[in-house]
Amino acid sequence: MPLVSVCMTTYNHEAYISQAIESVLAQHTDFGVEIVIGEDCSTDSTLEICRQYEQQYPDVVRVVTSPQNVGMHANYRRTIEACRGEYIAMLDGDDYFSDSNKLQMQVGAIEEAGAAMCYTRSERKSQTKITIYPQGKLHDSFADMLILNTAENCTTLARRDMILRYYD
């Protein structure tokens, strides 16, 4: 049983999905990690790329799909429900982890603090690699984080039970 599940939702991300998956496979951890990909009936070659990774890494990569597109919200829900890890890290098919120690550091931080979730600063870039949003400032309080809403989805790691309780 993996300690961390990476919940990766995707739709028409053929240009990005390999980088997203490879960034998880490159993680240095002392625990098990699985990648659960919610593929929402892409019209490009995203599903084929995901299936190739599933065949190459059958103990790590699982693809969740359906005969018809279910939309972003339902795709997240079914992918989260398919995750088996105690923790879930979010990563969409057009994002990637830039630090190969990300998951190890975040699990350590959550376990040391006894927290339910954590997130990191991030930098958002355009398709041409131009920085749109530079790394955000550190927040002084939980209220700041909620009001400023700068916790990017792809930086979040949370306890699975908390996500299932609150994600609707």
Range-by-range predicted roles:
Residues 1-168:
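Nucleotide-sugar donor-binding/catalytic module of glycosyltransferases
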